[in-house]
Amino acid sequence: MADDGVRLVKPGTKYEGAQGVMYDAGVSRDTAGAEKVCMNVLPMPPGAKAKPHYHKGIETIAYMRKGECTVFHGERLESQTVVKQGEQIFIPDDVPHAPCNLSEEECVWIVVHSSGDDQEDLIRTEDLDYILE
């Protein structure tokens, strides 16, 4: 039988992103050969904060599976959007952002990027770190 490229990705593999948060690896270039899209699970314990960053030329869609989280976004992270369970957020390419779980409960994101690798072309904006301290 010919290989049609369909792949099943099972849970269990974790990795730390350049954003400083731990992901549960999902479909990506590495796990399934996906070139144009990837999806990962991002559990964030209370108080967890991603480091400010943007994805050069890559769009992001994130679905809040459990809990709620504040996403700081904009050139100087001047805007805040609280995303609650069942809601989704779209972050255009090249927009600096940083999700921060300011609640007292764990939140769990399902994150999709328009690239086969969510860390590819991820640009850390270290000059914005002080804003989240």
Regions found by a protein language model. Name each.
Residues 51-53, 71-72, 80, 91, ...:
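Short beta-strand His + acidic residue motifs that chelate non-heme Fe in jelly-roll/DSBH
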Residues 58-85:
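A short beta-strand-loop-beta hairpin characteristic of the jelly-roll/cupin
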Residues 1-36, 51, 124-133:
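A short, N-terminal "cap"/entry segment at the start of jelly-roll beta-barrel domains
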Residues 84-85, 93-119:
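Ligand-binding loop in jelly-roll beta-barrel domains
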Residues 40-56:
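Conserved short histidine dyad/triad with adjacent acidic residue
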Residues 32-35, 44-49, 66-70, 115-119:
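Short, charged/polar surface micro-motifs in flexible loops or helix N-caps
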Residues 39-43, 61, 80, 88-90:
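Conserved hydrophobic/aromatic beta-strand scaffold that supports enzyme active sites
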